[in-house]
Regions:
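N-terminal organellar transit peptides
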Residues: 1-140, 144-189
Length: 189
């Protein structure tokens, strides 16, 4: 093989290596953007830049807690079917050392909120909640499900009797169901 052919092959390999390096940079940027999208879509991220280099997961519960019934498209919601798998993933990740829950919610679906609260209460890592603004209705059990709960001086919390929308049949079973839900809520408070 001539010297000219050898130089062309080396140039070709150098171009491929440069192209692979460029592709790697593009992939790394996509991964970084996906993390940003994850934060944008679900209000969750892992905080790592603190003084002790501890990995703390940030979970925000903002707006209405959405359960099986979808809220209107223009309402800010926290969807429990996104939060529950994330909580399971956090519990499974040995590198995450704690969780900070930020709350500003008007409440929402009782069953969905209680499911999230029960998952938060069962976490093996330390969990701290911070109420920013308000944590009303089903937001109260969400706030107190953590190991330590804090509220800003201007924050508010309000709990009220369970209500249902739609047609409710006035039977003993309906009353028992209301009582059961109320007891589940009171167990947290």
């Amino acid at each position: 093989m001539g010297k000219n052919q050898k130089n062309k092959k080396e140039e070709k390999w150098a171009d491929k290596a440069g192209s692979l390096s460029q592709e790697r940079k593009i992939r790394e940027k996509e991964i970084e953007e996906k993390g940003d999208i994850h934060l944008k879509n679900w209000g969750q991220m892992t905080l790592e830049g603190n003084e002790g280099k501890r990995r703390i997961h940030l979970l925000s519960i903002i707006g209405e807690v959405e359960g099986h019934e979808n809220a209107s498209g223009n309402a800010k919601t926290t969807k429990y079917d996104h939060v529950l798998p994330m909580l399971a993933q956090i519990e499974d990740d040995a590198q995450i050392e704690g969780m900070l829950v930020l709350l500003n919610t008007s409440g929402g679906d009782v069953d969905a909120g209680l499911a999230i609260a029960e998952m938060i209460a069962s976490m093996s890592i330390p969990v701290v909640s911070l109420v920013l603004g308000g944590s009303h209705s089903i937001g109260v059990p969400l706030a107190v499900a953590s190991d330590h709960s804090f509220i800003v001086p201007s924050g508010t919390m309000m709990v009220h009797p369970v209500r249902m929308s739609g047609m409710v049949i006035g039977t003993a079973q309906t009353y028992e169901y209301f009582e059961m839900i109320q007891d589940r809520i009171l167990n947290f408070v």
